[in-house]
Amino acid sequence: MAKYRKLGRTSSQRKALLRSQVTALIENGKIVTTEARAKEVKKMAEKLITLAVKEKDNFETVKVSAKVPKKDAEGKRVKEVVDGKKVTVYETVEKEIKKDLPSRLHARKQMDKVLYTVTEVPTAAAGKKKNTKTVDLTNKLFDEIAPKYAGRQGGYTRIVKIGLRKGDAAMEVLLELV
């Protein structure tokens, strides 16, 4: 008996397909796909969300001091002349950061194995690299999705049947986070 569906693809194609669909589900909250794919994606997504729920509070806050370049009103670095050279002026800033404990770090690395990095491009800058930003989906899992499902014991996703696809009559479904 097989542990998973083969989806009519080679192993590398299947893994890439499932990873991309899990990434899309976590990023957007819902995807439309075939029933067989949805059942496989559901398994993977549920495991990631369970990991996030277990490890969401497993961090410590640490105070860190960092040197940051001083900036003027226009946002440019302030320069100072020292021994005939222009040198950037730095100021020390105290910040509080979240430091993952070992179990949460391991969970983060397990999630990064499955999820692709997502680059968000604003519609005004479509096709350009300027103003793009990468979205950290592991942080989204820990900070947004895990607190939402904190009191829930599994069943984080729902499959809703839409109907048959026109081209090949495959059953299409909507897979969404509950």
From Swiss-Prot:
It comes from the Bacteria. GO terms for cellular component: cytosolic large ribosomal subunit. Signal peptide: none annotated. GO terms for biological process: translation. InterPro entries: Ribosomal_bL17, Ribosomal_bL17_sf. It holds the Pfam family Ribosomal_L17. GO terms for molecular function: structural constituent of ribosome. Keywords: Ribonucleoprotein, Ribosomal protein. The keyword Membrane does not apply. Belongs to the bacterial ribosomal protein bL17 family. Part of the 50S ribosomal subunit. Contacts protein L32. This is Large ribosomal subunit protein bL17. It comes from Lachnospira eligens (strain ATCC 27750 / DSM 3376 / VPI C15-48 / C15-B4). The lineage of its organism: Bacteria, Bacillati, Bacillota, Clostridia, Lachnospirales.
